[in-house]
Amino acid sequence: MLSFTYERRFESHPDYAELWGIRKAIREIQSNLRKKSHGEKETARNRLSRLRFRATELEVKIDTELFDEARVVACTLVGSANRVLTNRNFTTLFIDEAAQALEAACWIAIGKADRVILAGDHHQLPPTIKCIEAARGGLDHTLMQKITDRKPETVSLLKTQYRMNEDIMRFPSRWFYHDELQSAPEVKHRGILEFDTPVVWLDTADCHFEEDRLDDSMSRINRDEATLLVSTLQKYIEKIGKERVLDESIDFGLISPYKSQVQYIRGLIKRDTFFKPFRRLITAHTVDGFQGQERDVIMISLVRANDKGRIGFLGDLRRMNVAITRARMKLMILGDAPTLTRHAFYKELYEYIWENGQVITCLLYTS
């Protein structure tokens, strides 16, 4: 791919050697300018002016030829405003990951195209807006979302998915995609262990784990739940077989919506010598860190456990959709059911797993 980048194509152009020589000459003249007399400086400046004019002339010539020949140009939305694309028009503009693109950024590129195709999933992560006031003002409402809401007839859903076991897929399909997703035959029944249950909820309620709020941040942590997750991971690796995990490079994703929980889990993994051979196969990250990725096994620590049913930004269901759909063959959710199931989404998810997977009390893993 590097050979097709703008920089590499530019450097491969027949006129680049002359341009490089001119740039070198400019640098040499500039470095020696202070040492020259007044008259010599004037001569040098005149030469610099001519060299710079010729360098600009060559740059424009190379750019024009490169982009005249190009059938496809790939760039960021903001990058489409680069001077090399000035006054250029394109038949079709594809905006990938459009659900994460700010509308204002989209319009930078849209003005250069006759038609636009937005590709993405507005049921997954939105753009990152650091200013709360801007988000409340609508900056986090993307162009893709607006089109989906106002012109649903223009939307096409890619219905066949090639990642997940069907039991993992069915719930997000039902909740987010009008039950329209289908599994490709080669992944429909994929699994690691024979007779294994693809979807499991490990209910922490009976263990009375407690969430904590860190003093220096808004983040939450549930240390006992993190310890249970790591213990459960070890048991599952042992169940599969250590050699098989290494031979087949079976990989594991440990996800939590809370950064503090992720950091605590990473520390537990790092300090436990059992995981040393498997560390390259284990990734612990927030939901945002897993966007666009997938793992054979996904374990999710939901953290929240309180008497009032407060779940904070677990209520952003787009993040949960991302977390759930990262798994290829095994999905394990660790969470306090009485706290979480006060929310309609988690109630239905819990009931789905009860009926189609397996709900296990934490007592079986801590005894």
Residue ranges and their predicted role:
Residues 2-91:
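Conserved helicase NTPase catalytic core signature
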Residues 3, 8-10, 14-15, 78-367:
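Conserved helicase motor core of SF1/SF2 NTP-dependent helicases
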